């Protein structure tokens, strides 16, 4: 029965196109998270432009997804959830672009914080890979275990927040602008894991709806 329902949900041409496009969205998130790791680990400002291009491509994919859904892909009960997922994935790409742009405005990152930021960027990347696994699990199964792994990684980042903000108190910023850009950079870097977890929650809602 479950397999037959999934065939009805995912079997149409427009439905398959939307599924493939959402998969491309998540793959873009994976690629962009890897770029962010490179930016933070090696101060590789040259790839900031690649992050911006990924965001533009992601936005075009989101528009295409929404258009196909409103043109009749999926049964009405599922359309809003698929649209929500596309919007949430686009928000992750927006956040990653903001982080990359803010990095250009930061004069320096203390070594003790750079290590923390590298760890966060690496965890965000791992969560992005798991998000693709979670989306594929809508058809293949095993979603609960994947979402649990995402939750555990998100909690690891949450546990780092207090330590990071404590270290921030010891940094001597030259002025308000430098402080503001640095704080926004930290907030957004920490927020990526929350956004990925939110997208995972929407995938879970879709899984329940499909049943």
Curated annotation (Swiss-Prot):
State the coiled-coil residue ranges: none
Cystine connections: none
Entry superkingdom: Archaea
Q: Which organism is it from?
A: Archaeoglobus fulgidus (strain ATCC 49558 / DSM 4304 / JCM 9628 / NBRC 100126 / VC-16)
Lineage of the species this protein comes from: Archaea, Methanobacteriati, Methanobacteriota, Archaeoglobi, Archaeoglobales
The record's comment on protein family reads: Belongs to the UPF0111 family.
The molecule here is called: UPF0111 protein AF_2149
InterPro entries, alphabetized: DUF47 (IPR002727), PhoU-like_sf (IPR038078), Put_Phosphate_transp_reg (IPR018445)
